[in-house]
Amino acid sequence: MSKQLDLSKRLQAVANLVSPKRRVADIGCDHGYVSIYLADVRKCPKVIAMDVRKGPLSQAQNNIHRFGMDDRIEMRLSDGTALLEPDEVDTLLISGMGGRLIMRIVSEGLDRLGAFKELVLQPQSEAELVRKFLREHDYIIVDEDFVIEDGKNYPMMKALHVSCLDEWDRESGQQHDAFTLFDYSVKQQDLFGPVLLKKRPADFCTFLDQKRKKTEEILQQITQPEKRKEMQDYLQQLIDVSKGM
């Protein structure tokens, strides 16, 4: 590829979570830049760029052609994983969607196709529900990142099916058991991310600080007892996990 592809901070972080040389389905590919990056830089031998809308898929196709990647990336007009075949990809990548939609797409894929080796997810909302969903469906979060871009918070995660953990240990040189954090409750790990709590990237620490201050402000305005108790509990969670900063 002769042209230079510059990804946004968020998309670069998402792309970096995809393991190199894997077959990838990019669900909701939008403009196709991540698919192009994966095929070129991450050396993924098979990339399927998928979107439910004709407009974004057409734009992605134009970009893929512009970067000379027509023979490296396949395009499919598909609602989620509907047009994927069993064992066609190793990695399912979904970014820029709400948490509940991501869970629905993954759940439908698991029901129809069986377990994917790797899930790379960037939920725009309800990341804690996505983490809980992964845990309940035999996926272990082995890496995470957190990006603040244009004033918006973007958590993202890589999860492997339990059947693939030994393979990941060998390839990465890490032990997945190292991500078990006994200092934090399951609730705290779901809320804030087990690997984020361990790695503490700069944007994540900024998020925790801003979230704590905002929660304190909101708490002063709440008078309804149940809502106040709920907000106090959340503030305490923030204070507890922030102690490691």
What are these regions (language model features)?
Residues 32, 36:
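Glycine-rich SAM-binding Motif I of class I
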Residues 39-40:
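Gly/Ala-rich phosphate-binding loop of Rossmann-like dinucleotide-binding domains
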Residues 46-51:
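Conserved SAM-binding motif I beta-strand of class I
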